[in-house]
Amino acid sequence: MAGDAERARPVPPPSSGFSTPPPDRAPAPGGAGGVPHQDAVHPWLASYPPGVDWGALPVPATLPEMLRHAVARFGERPCLDFFGRGWTYAQLGAQVDRAAEGFRRLGVRKGTHVGLCMPNCPFYVISYFAVLKAGGVVVNFNPLHMPMELSAQARASDTRIMVVLDLEPMLERVLGLLRRPGREDGPLRHVVACRFAGALPALKGIGFRLARRASIGTVPRHDPQVTLFDTLLEAPPLGDGPAITPGDVAVLQFTGGTTGRPKGAVLTHANLTANLEQVRCWFHECREGEERLLAVLPFFHVFAMTVALNAGLAWGAEIVLLPRYDQASFRTALRRKPPTLLPGVPTLFKAILDAGTPRAMLSSVRFCISGGAPLPLEVKHDFEAASGCVLVEGYGLTEASPVCFCNPLVGENRAGSIGLPLPGVEAEIRALDDPGRALLPGERGELCVRGPNVMQGYWGEPEETARVLLPDGFLRTGDVGIMAPDGYVTLVDRIKDIILCSGFNVYPRAIEEALYTHPDVAAATVLGMPDPYRGESPAAFVQPRPGASLTMEDLHAFLAERLSPIERPRLIELREELPRTAVGKLSKTELRQELRERHPRGGA
């Protein structure tokens, strides 16, 4: 957690990125020019890639500072592209400045919580940095959430102002959260509505309005609680804005954490700028001012917010915005603006494969990073073979801003492993029954991390904060893993997902990996179901490839040759689609509830 000493440190331009390591930290052999050696405390040093210094610490900074330096360095370079309409860095900077004044006119002060409920679009980017420059705190909302979910998060986060697109049902749901006469319990005080068609090129904007009238909501006119985004840009200057420090809160990012109940992770400017610099340091082969990044993952998800938005702008990349993934829009973007960088989640790379995307369409892509969920070995191998680009698996969690581990771009890109700790990140495997006790390499336990990117805690949740943030500063991730003697970490499963079967620990990921080796399996997820004899047994839900003639009997026979008897699923069900989160990750929540309802007491 950021302390007063850290907040008092000088803040040079983010282009410098890292400070020299303090005396009590061992320098990494790659960037520091040392000879790789084995370190009992930091075994990953022996494997660290050349040119990357683990011992260097990110210099605390603020996100508006980062943007200001990016605008100064890359002013006339293309910054954003939205279906053919472009913004330069200078244009983005100017609109952020004007919108920040508008938010201040609306009453945003230092610490005011402002919700962003939008897919990827220019309004999100402008609002994100404008709220931060005005001193506010960004609270990301999933625009696909139902009214009850939006209301619960708005109340839990003390969100008072919400920015939303004028598309239905998004707009109606957010307007329904306003506190009005007869609805005094509404959590919101003000809504800022953005005209989606206004972000499109002129002809496309007209076409959208004509073709999609049913999708365009009605923004109330002359309503003192509703402001058009365009009006924000017309606000006259109010003078100097608030002083923002690295230790100030920047984002409340909601997560299920390790318990499944949504909680707001408190992320400071120092946390988020540290993580974007850690990512930039790891991907130091990226060419500043020359890259083009395809942003198909939603910015309201912390992985995309850090890797695609924050790091993308710090790199001086052109960011091509897609509001959602569909194969037609994706292929159009590949042809029109060939990307060099593609962050994604496993299901995105799987979808690209399943759609038969031609290798030539991916020829411009140099690096892909997969996060958000474990990357199946088959997906990694097949995607690299089909695309010709490097796909590295990383790992992170919302509570760490989020990226903590990644496989090297140069050196061993170890399949099945989340890689090595990023610069400044310390990692230990702790005993499952005693999170204060570190284990030796090769032993299985809970992965714990410590570093400048780790959150300050959960908003309004002191007990939950104390449960996951240990007294020595390490964060409990809730993931079971093994650290090899050379520092590479392999995750076995989530602690909450381990299936206790006849007294044995059964790991769903091992069963899922076996299922993915079947040529007719498109997606698979495994979880525990009540069993009157064993306590729990594995249950597998499988989505076949389109056109495949797959049967449950086929899969039972297939797994019988690959899994031990106790690992073999008692139940296998085929589904046309499996539940997914907003970023395309497979979700076990709905299936777990379904199994509880079908087998309330462990019956057959």
Label the model's feature ranges.
Residues 291, 317, 367-368, 375-394, ...:
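Conserved AMP-binding/adenylate-forming
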